[in-house]
């Protein structure tokens, strides 16, 4: 099944109906993921289109809609990993609200970011070094090793807070017929890492909770030398509910149309479940023509 994220166009619309009609008319998708840039003012039009049977929803990306005090896409504005109880509670409450909206719109999935370990944001530093031709130079390796040591030493309390929040959220989702996908993240600082995710899923042990693959994010991590994209999917792929489908131009330009970058979809897609949801998550800078062309290529290779 394929779907299309509103992250492509939510920022340029003030009416939910027009946002969804652009997706239907310009790129040809009748199934949509509501991204994390959906302002509350867009929701009446979204509900109207759904009630009229003009659109279906595959998924909502937390937080959806945005908290009223937040004016632009901010999926990490409140974090389950925070040391501050008030922030964690706000994150949980906003997530429960997203689950309620998903139930109302018949969307089976909600995609989650879980937070981060507070540390120097090493990912962007490493990308900057790569762009200077210093991949695996001494400076690069030194920074990377130091970051790994720091994260491994600091992560346990952050992970514990994330696990406590996810248990509550998964229990709530179980009564709403909504499943939760923990997104594979771009930043090494973010939670969970690929080492942590299988353990986290095992410990919570809920059928409501699974993995949400992001082809662009994980390709960036491969480009940085943190993992092997194919081997990671061989390990985790069958626990994926869905994925954000995008390509990545070396080293870290993601949210590109499939088949325009370095992601080897032909060998990676078969490692995901046959019922996996594939959501096009495109940069707003990509044209409708570029997207339509990628969809046609996808259908040639993988069918609808």
Residue ranges, per PLM feature:
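Short hydrophobic interaction/assembly module
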Residues: 50-74
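Short, basic/glycine-rich phosphate-binding loops at helix/coil junctions
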Residues: 75, 140-146, 244-249
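Histidine-acidic metal/acid-base catalytic patches
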Residues: 1-25, 40, 45, 51-56, ...
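Short glycine-enriched loops at secondary-structure junctions
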Residues: 7-11, 61-68, 115-117
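Active-site loop/turn elements of alpha/beta-hydrolase fold enzymes
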Residues: 36, 62, 114-115, 185, ...
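Active-site acidic/histidine proton-transfer and metal-coordination neighborhood
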Residues: 80-210
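Short acidic/His/Gly/Ser-rich catalytic and metal-binding motifs that mark active-site loops
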Residues: 66-73, 119-122, 252
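A short beta-strand-loop structural module common to alpha/beta enzyme folds
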Residues: 30-39
């Amino acid at each position: 099944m394929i779907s299309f994220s509103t992250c492509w166009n939510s920022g340029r619309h003030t009416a939910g109906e027009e946002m969804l009609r652009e997706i239907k008319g310009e790129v040809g998708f009748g199934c949509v993921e509501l991204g994390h840039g959906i302002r509350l003012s867009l929701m009446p039009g979204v509900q109207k289109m759904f009630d009229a049977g003009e659109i279906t929803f595959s998924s909502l990306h937390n937080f959806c809609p945005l908290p009223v005090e937040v004016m632009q896409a901010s999926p990490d504005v409140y974090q389950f990993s925070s040391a501050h109880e008030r922030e964690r509670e706000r994150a949980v409450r906003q997530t429960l609200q997203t689950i309620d909206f998903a139930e109302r719109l018949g969307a089976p999935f909600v995609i989650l970011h879980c937070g981060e370990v507070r540390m120097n944001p090493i990912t962007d530093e490493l990308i900057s070094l790569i762009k200077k031709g210093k991949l695996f130079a001494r400076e690069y390796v030194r920074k990377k090793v130091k970051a790994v040591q720091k994260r491994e030493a600091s992560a346990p309390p952050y992970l514990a807070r994330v696990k406590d929040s996810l248990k509550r959220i998964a229990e709530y989702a179980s009564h709403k017929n909504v499943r939760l996908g923990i997104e594979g993240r771009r930043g090494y600082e973010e939670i969970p890492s690929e080492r942590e995710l299988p353990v986290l899923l095992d410990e919570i042990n809920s059928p409501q909770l699974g993995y949400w693959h992001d082809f662009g994010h994980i390709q960036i991590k491969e480009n940085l030398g943190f993992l092997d994209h194919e081997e990671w999917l061989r390990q985790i792929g069958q626990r994926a509910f869905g994925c954000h489908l995008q390509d990545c131009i070396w080293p870290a330009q993601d949210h590109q149309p499939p088949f325009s970058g370095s992601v080897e979809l032909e060998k990676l897609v078969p490692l995901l479940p046959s019922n996996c949801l594939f959501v096009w998550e495109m940069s707003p800078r990509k044209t409708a023509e570029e997207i339509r062309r990628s969809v046609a290529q996808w259908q040639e290779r993988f069918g609808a």
